Amino acid sequence: MVVQTRFPSWIILCYIWLLGFAHTGEAQAAKEVLLLDSKAQQTELEWISSPPSGWEEISGLDENYTPIRTYQVCQVMEPNQNNWLRTNWISKGNAQRIFVELKFTLRDCNSLPGVLGTCKETFNLYYYETDYDTGRNIRENLYVKIDTIAADESFTQGDLGERKMKLNTEVREIGPLSKKGFYLAFQDVGACIALVSVKVYYKKCWSIVENLAVFPDTVTGSEFSSLVEVRGTCVSSAEEEAENSPRMHCSAEGEWLVPIGKCICKAGYQQKGDTCEPCGRRFYKSSSQDLQCSRCPTHSFSDREGSSRCECEDGYYRAPSDPPYVACTRPPSAPQNLIFNINQTTVSLEWSPPADNGGRNDVTYRILCKRCSWEQGECVPCGSNIGYMPQQTGLEDNYVTVMDLLAHANYTFEVEAVNGVSDLSRSQRLFAAVSITTGQAAPSQVSGVMKERVLQRSVQLSWQEPEHPNGVITEYEIKYYEKDQRERTYSTLKTKSTSASINNLKPGTVYVFQIRAVTAAGYGNYSPRLDVATLEEASGKMFEATAVSSEQNPVIIIAVVAVAGTIILVFMVFGFIIGRRHCGYSKADQEGDEELYFHFKFPGTKTYIDPETYEDPNRAVHQFAKELDASCIKIERVIGAGEFGEVCSGRLKLPGKRDVAVAIKTLKVGYTEKQRRDFLCEASIMGQFDHPNVVHLEGVVTRGKPVMIVIEFMENGALDAFLRKHDGQFTVIQLVGMLRGIAAGMRYLADMGYVHRDLAARNILVNSNLVCKVSDFGLSRVIEDDPEAVYTTTGGKIPVRWTAPEAIQYRKFTSASDVWSYGIVMWEVMSYGERPYWDMSNQDVIKAIEEGYRLPAPMDCPAGLHQLMLDCWQKDRAERPKFEQIVGILDKMIRNPSSLKTPLGTCSRPLSPLLDQSTPDFTAFCSVGEWLQAIKMERYKDNFTAAGYNSLESVARMTIDDVMSLGITLVGHQKKIMSSIQTMRAQMLHLHGTGIQV
């Protein structure tokens, strides 16, 4: 009896036919590259089956009634089945990792009768790599198993009747592959199975344009997690962004990951979608970094597509430093309204800006000087011996001073406005011109100074006329002083001859003599210094006896007349001094010993001389201030503005000396003669002072424009602003050191008889070593009768907060009123530049002071310092300390730093009432709330209550840290509250005589 081993194939075929109608084919994924698709082949597949009786190829129909080729096997009746089915050789192309998709049906073994021991529900999948087709033999041992394939769903006989479709799909991966191709093989071990379709493919990332970069087709990597980095290629007219080349990564699933880097359109092109298109006419793009094309700037054009810059129209230019987006410009027109002012051999030129600046803001001016002959009118360049102030070219201001011209000569000056494109233009120069004739010049330097005779108390000198007198010499001026005084105190003698005898000198003393000539044009330069030592007492008498005996009676008579004349002169000076005591003080009244303008000069002392006593202010400034050559001064930058002009920083380089940093005050253009006189008055005052704590005057420039006052440069500027900038950063010793320096400078001024009248922290300058120096020796100030009671100057108003009450009420300014101001300066320093009396009005300040109120101690101020402030604020000026005493007190504090740690209120003297704008004595308060309301800080009432400060005694113990812990963050409010607490604490100490523990 023959046992049937093959299950009826029509059952499976029928099921496949049903699937063809029920199953909808899937579209091929765009990221897959097919190597094999059995459904796509309508002819026989002709795969190899081993044994031939195993797998059989049958035909079916898909949903479109298109024939499809499938393989089936159903030998479930016999055990130990080994049926192989092998595909044809498959070329892998560029793939490294292959995907195999199987669609199949499988019969449920339980639905077949009599096959439970032999029926299987799985089959095996194999592959074999080879570089070529090996023929039709299947060498099973060469095949590598991929996996055992099982069905998720199997069908039964009932499914056929009910038309239930159960198609399985499985996908497996192969790789990495190293050879050119491979075979797939299917091993049946006793299942009833039909392969509906076999699809073999690999994945790749398809070409894409991203960020103007083209990324080509890229096969995925060999591993599941591998990423293939691909560098993009810029599209046409694009370039890679600097240090940011375009890259993308192709994932194992055939997807491009987030792009890195990008391409950008080149200059002259802009992006449009995934391409770069050229800029149109009249448009440009200068850089690849720009996003879009821009319209050509004014006075420029582009006549072709893809322009990276626009060309300038005729007559217009673009400077090398101008960016392409700037409009084309042209040279400026000529300056307007050129005027001149001749001062002997110096010419000042001023002009107005050009009507047309060419469309630029970098207009400067340059000066061309020509000297013209009298006869033929021919002109030649002036040469390098001419000086220009501030400079000849690159002038930013509309004025210049030309110096060192020849006397009685013809000159032509051309002033040209230039800008950044002037040198590019080939057009004719545009300038304003003026022709002038110089006048008489000052004489040149006196030479040949010789000592003719030297006695005990006199020296006779002779000299030669200047080589270039430049006119008629009206007189000679002899300046002399003791050598060890170094010009701090000097005398002058004038004569019309070329010799003179200087009398009333000290025996055995070295004197320095210098002589200069004077003409109608002005003063010449001083001659070189001549050192002469007078004879000693004994040798002088012997010499004088010899001189008398040799010259006989005429000399004796002359000596007697000279002595008599000297006595008469002394009496005249005394009379003049007494007369001035009854005439009053020209700036402001001073009392008694404060009128020290014509004191006799005793050895080692020097007296301040009021410049207003000179009929000619120019003589005063030349008497006390050194005239500087403007060419020695280099202005670097503007650092502020004064009452009469700008304040600049710069460098001063005198011949034979190293250059030094200086501050330069300039007189603005268009000044009046009174403004010039007032401006130079400060130099006449400063020139008399020589002290390390008083700002030093280097010199003045009066013979050119701009008129300048040159002083030493103080790096840290005004003291009040400096302290506010460095709030809380200094030790008490450092602050006391600053105060000591200010007091020393004021002591020096007081000893000279000078009353400052405007001492305030804003008028104290600080250098890099924290040395404080007194400054601002400016104009006369007149007190106005207005309710604010302020000084008025031509530059503005000065508040009364620093002024002593008698100076406000009676206009009495003395060193004692300066002491009051110094007390305010002390308060400013210890409070780090806080405004005295805060936001009180001037009228309230005057009223409070009259009622006996004074400023409270600043936060953390030692008691000794505050007591010194109170001493300076004594209403009776006679009870205020002198500056000499103040310096001594501060010196003791510095030598004994422990005295500066004494808390406020431990001093033996009772404190004066302390000023608070609206706070009466603390005993008038019944609660903390009333106290806060009185000082206008009631907003913090809840803060105090929440922290447990319910009594004034507890408040008096508070420190600044306690105040800050309440959540009070405004520094001004912290200081105001703390100042009031210190006031309260001081009054408690005074009332109870015992300290309050803090």
UniProtKB/Swiss-Prot annotation:
A motif (PDZ-binding) lies at residues 996-998. Residues 577-998 are cytoplasmic. It holds the Pfam family Ephrin_lbd. It catalyses: L-tyrosyl-[protein] + ATP = O-phospho-L-tyrosyl-[protein] + ADP + H(+). Disruption phenotype: Mice are viable, fertile and show no gross morphological or behavioral defects. However, topographic targeting errors of nasal and temporal retinal axons appear during development of the retinocollicular projections in the visual system. 10 percent of the embryos also display exencephalic overgrowth of forebrain tissues which might be the result of reduced apoptosis. Residues 28-555 are extracellular. This is Ephrin type-A receptor 7. It comes from Mus musculus (Mouse). The lineage of its organism: Eukaryota, Metazoa, Chordata, Craniata, Vertebrata.
